[in-house]
């Protein structure tokens, strides 16, 4: 290690001293701790095999980007995303919805994947019926966790969660319907907005609602980051490293799936992801210092390698 | 037609002048109308195939017993289960959760059924991936419908719904784990309480919460009716008519599934269903005339032929 690196001088661009990797590490640690407690609580109920499979699915790693967006968005609007707060409950619920979608997405009848985050998928590690039930149960568990404290303020967030979850399913169905035929650019954008954009967007808006009771103008930030995230995901599938990603790459091409990079080219797709990120940053600029983490996450969404 | 039948003298037992078939017909008509509107709303969104499959699943008939229990329970406690009210929204949400569970239950990886209510199951009429997504989407849609109006009172009902849905999944998992091995009577009762009892129970308790903001002592009624309903279901599978039921009979025996009738005999199982019904009726007796429909439903649960 050079002296410069040790002293931190070269540790990031001058305009962004915020350590996003450290932030994400801290959020994951916290989210994983809570998910572990939720899974342990499930394991006190029967049957054990379902509870173990739920734990296996929930604690399989992952960047916990959606929870990070919820907490950072809450902070950005002056909220305190402390332990047991509404923002944290929403963050965990959103991650459970995301996790359920991965479990079902991997099923033989869907994407038929054997590997997820470097481990056997749930239907491989257990069986297909258990994987169906793990997904179903995680969706219920998400709503139960969010609503279980009896806090009436959770109603608006649960409605947002349900809406995002439904749009995600519509996106999956668009994706399945698209296999084997050529989508237009508009169709690809519609698919992206639903399949991935809906939950990313719900994360940003949900953090704002948890902090202030309203979306407070963050809807476009959610939409832009959702778009940027999915373009980055498609670029990583084309150009990324399977080991770093913990999943197969080149899947979209192999499945004949149209993505934005496949339609407009890698460079143009990269430019559009950057532009979407910049538009989100422009909306966040007036929020000043409290939005520092959210702005760093917006940049991470497009620059990430995993 | 004899004169006596035409004049209605023989149309029911003297102690129960309440026309439960007519009540159920009116509830189904109302529930079907609302579900049709919900499905039509989905069909304004894309993709069309998912929306059509959701409509196919939602409007496949069914007794609408759970919605009837919600509305009757609400009435029993002096509530007005009018159009667009909280009880009606909960009733529809509960029926959507029930419908999703049937769609997933019929999947090849689960019970592998080709027929449901006399029609091809969703994965037969469409395909397996669509059936997974229809179930997933219906669960989200249930919560969205219940919470979508922004009524904070919906939070408690959505928590109840989530809890019932999760217990139902645990019951399904217990059921799958039980195949091929002999369950004890306690295990069978546990399985029944979770797999079917949870939603039946949620229906009764949810109606009370919609009417008064609290379960108002109706939890035991929900539990007893859930037990009675499942025993009746198992008896119909053993002795019922496939045409009237719209599904295969003798399934449990063929699959080697332990049921209460298979463990204790048909007569004893029938006696226990009757006793559970009587216990529910005893709790409901002090509620008087407003609980007439709920008491008639309690009797229907054990006397039904479909």
Label each region the model flagged.
Chain A
Residues 1-39:
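N-terminal amphipathic/basic leader segments beginning at the initiator methionine
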Residues 44-282, 289-302:
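Mg2+-dependent prenyl diphosphate-binding active-site environment of isoprenoid biosynthetic enzymes
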């Amino acid at each position: 290690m050079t002296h410069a690196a040790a002293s931190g001088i070269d540790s990031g661009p001058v305009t962004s001293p915020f350590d996003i990797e450290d932030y994400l590490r801290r959020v994951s640690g916290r989210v994983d701790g809570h998910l572990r407690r939720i899974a342990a609580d499930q394991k006190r109920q029967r049957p054990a095999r379902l509870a173990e499979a739920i734990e296996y699915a929930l604690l399989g790693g992952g960047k916990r980007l959606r929870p990070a967006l919820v907490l950072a968005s809450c902070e950005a609007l002056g909220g305190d995303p402390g332990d047991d707060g509404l923002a944290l409950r929403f963050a965990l619920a959103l991650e459970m919805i995301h996790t359920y979608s991965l479990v079902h997405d991997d099923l033989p009848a869907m994407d038929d994947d054997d590997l997820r985050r470097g481990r056997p998928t749930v239907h491989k590690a257990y069986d297909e019926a258990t994987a169906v039930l793990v997904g179903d149960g995680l969706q219920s568990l998400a709503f139960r966790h969010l609503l279980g404290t009896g806090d009436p303020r959770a109603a608006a967030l649960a409605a947002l969660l349900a809406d995002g979850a439904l749009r995600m399913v519509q996106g999956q169905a668009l994706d399945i319907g698209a296999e084997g035929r050529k989508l237009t650019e508009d169709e690809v954008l519609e698919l992206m907005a639903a399949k991935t954009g809906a939950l990313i967007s719900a994360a940003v808006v949900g953090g704002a609602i948890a902090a202030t009771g309203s979306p407070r103008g963050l809807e476009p930030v959610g939409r832009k980051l959702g778009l940027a995230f999915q373009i980055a995901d498609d670029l990583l599938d084309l150009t990324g490293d399977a080991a770093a990603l913990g999943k197969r790459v080149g899947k979209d091409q192999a499945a004949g799936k149209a993505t934005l990079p496949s339609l407009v080219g890698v460079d143009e797709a990269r430019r559009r992801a950057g532009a979407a990120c910049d538009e989100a940053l422009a909306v966040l600029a007036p929020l000043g210092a409290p939005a520092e983490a959210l702005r760093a996450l917006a940049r991470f969404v497009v620059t990430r390698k995993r």
